[in-house]
């Protein structure tokens, strides 16, 4: 009887630990943030879109929305070729909250320089917050839902 209880305990412990996110999961999500920023700074719409799931939902600071990785790529391609072609983005203050072993919410504060108005004038530094729902796909994490907000001067 004690052996059976011990084996059941081991089985349950294994099930619990299998559902607990690991430090590797946190590292993988932080790498996702790094990949996102790197793709942005290279103005590579394809690499940028690769950080999203095939069925991702994307909403930018102007409330423009796209659905799907291909739509995210197509949305960013003309901007990376024009008004965002000289932008540089940084990300910090990354907060990760695991909702399950395969789903996490991520907040990332960002700053961007080099954006242009439609008339070609440079926009001053922009700051904001990315809010993501990320999901595990094998050993990789991808953005399933993204909402982006730009801070007004008083919130910076």
Predicted segments — roles?
Residues 118-124, 153-156:
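A short acidic/glycine-rich loop-to-helix N-cap element
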Residues 126-154:
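Short beta-strand edge/turn micro-motifs at domain boundaries
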Residues 13, 17-54, 155-156:
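Short, low-complexity N-terminal intrinsically disordered segments enriched in polar/charged residues
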């Amino acid at each position: 009887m004690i052996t059976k209880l011990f084996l059941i305990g081991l089985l349950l412990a294994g099930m619990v630990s299998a559902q607990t996110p690991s430090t590797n999961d946190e590292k993988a999500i932080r790498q996702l943030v790094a990949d996102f920023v790197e793709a942005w700074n290279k103005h590579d719409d394809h690499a940028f879109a690769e950080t999203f799931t095939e069925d991702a939902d994307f909403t930018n600071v102007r409330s423009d929305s796209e659905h799907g990785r291909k739509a995210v790529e197509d949305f960013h391609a003309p901007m990376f070729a024009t008004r965002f072609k000289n932008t540089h983005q940084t990300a910090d203050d990354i907060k990760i909250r695991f909702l399950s072993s395969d789903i996490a919410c991520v907040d990332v504060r960002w700053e961007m320089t080099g954006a242009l108005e439609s008339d070609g004038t440079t926009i001053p530094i922009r700051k904001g917050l990315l809010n993501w729902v990320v999901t595990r796909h094998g050993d990789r994490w991808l953005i399933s839902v993204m909402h982006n907000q730009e801070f007004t001067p008083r919130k910076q």
